[in-house]
């Protein structure tokens, strides 16, 4: 079982927001998450992102793989995903 840190789509039609979650890689996009690590609101005037960095570091140390989109969001917001990867 491979575990990934990725986005889970929420919200209404044309007004999405995303939760940053830990999921089994075989789970569907909107499936059951193991743990929620934060959120990302792309539609707001000021795009909001909040992440529990300590929990993310813990999951990465356990072998969780970041999705490409989550890596991009972390790099854009200076949260240094690369320095957290094992």
From Swiss-Prot:
InterPro entries: Ribosomal_bS16 (IPR000307), Ribosomal_bS16_CS (IPR020592), Ribosomal_bS16_dom_sf (IPR023803)
GO biological process: translation
Keywords of this entry: Ribonucleoprotein, Ribosomal protein
Any one GO MF annotation of this record: structural constituent of ribosome
Pfam families: Ribosomal_S16
Lineage: superkingdom: Bacteria
Protein name, as recorded: Small ribosomal subunit protein bS16
Source organism (scientific name): Borrelia garinii subsp. bavariensis (strain ATCC BAA-2496 / DSM 23469 / PBi)
